[in-house]
């Protein structure tokens, strides 16, 4: 094919984070994060794509131990049975990294794949991901991914917050 392809830019796993907030009905919200976040930014034919892979087993929850147990359980993230959380974006214009906007793609969670759209925040640096974070926010419905347990305690929406740094070219 006549497409121009550049080598992928991998995420810097030590500088990239994935965190989330669960909204509880009668208690303060619960925050969590994943300590193993990998991925890459690919360029092909003038468009870019991003793939993100999170190891669900690396889940760390703030707050009481019961929240961590509940979040890891089969009723919620089912991290032991489905440890891979994966997002693959649709191709997008490289200006999206600077200007911000909707980042659309497929999210795989709990062994189920669904369309997802996240908000990519604008950046002010020359090389997004290298000189500053690529910051992505969004929300997913627990119900869409089969997380129907604890509905009396946990609201449906889970807020996601990704901050990505890329390995600088020449430092691989």
Predicted regions: what is each one?
Residues 1-172:
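Low-complexity, acidic/polar, glycine-enriched regions of mature
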């Amino acid at each position: 094919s006549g497409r121009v392809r550049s080598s992928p830019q991998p995420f810097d796993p030590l500088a990239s984070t994935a965190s989330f907030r669960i909204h509880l009905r009668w208690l303060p919200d619960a925050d969590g994060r994943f300590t193993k976040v990998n991925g890459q930014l690919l360029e092909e034919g003038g468009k870019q794509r991003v793939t993100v892979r999170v190891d669900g087993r690396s889940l760390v929850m703030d707050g009481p131990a019961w929240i961590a147990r509940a979040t890891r359980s089969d009723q919620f993230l089912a991290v032991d049975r489905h440890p891979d959380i994966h997002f693959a974006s649709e191709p997008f214009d490289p200006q999206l990294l600077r200007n911000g906007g909707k980042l659309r793609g497929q999210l795989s969670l709990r062994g189920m794949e669904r369309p997802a759209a996240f908000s990519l925040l604008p950046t002010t640096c020359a090389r997004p991901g290298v000189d500053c974070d690529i910051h992505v926010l969004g929300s997913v419905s627990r119900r869409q991914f089969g997380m129907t347990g604890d509905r009396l305690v946990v609201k449906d929406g889970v807020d996601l917050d990704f901050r990505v740094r890329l390995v600088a070219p020449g430092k691989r």
